[in-house]
């Protein structure tokens, strides 16, 4: 992603979209929470998506995420849409790619807003739209030896 400062994935001063990244290393809830700090915000909402041990009645052993090169740009587009719809003071979203195991963090998103109801609503919109609009794919491997690709995480 093109950045206007020396820290890739981070925004320029004044931009409520503080952190957008796709990473092949472990994610940090603390990093996302720190990015959401704003003295005018009374509510901060976070969503942390983890790798679960089952899907559709089948036992999951592991999974991998892959993405299109445009994934970060699409994440930013989704983030800007949320910022336009809600009174967001700060927003951050980070998604993992590569091989993950049960319990690993797959995605961490969050928003800060003046009030809690707005923060909850904006965070839900952010994760739902990321899931449906950003070109990130999940490759699940099941304990019975089968596997499945799931489009747009």
Where do the model's predicted regions map?
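N-terminal, polar/charged subdomain of small-to-medium soluble alpha/beta proteins
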Residues: 1-106, 114-124, 128-153
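Phosphate/diphosphate ligand-binding glycine-rich loop within oxidoreductases
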Residues: 109
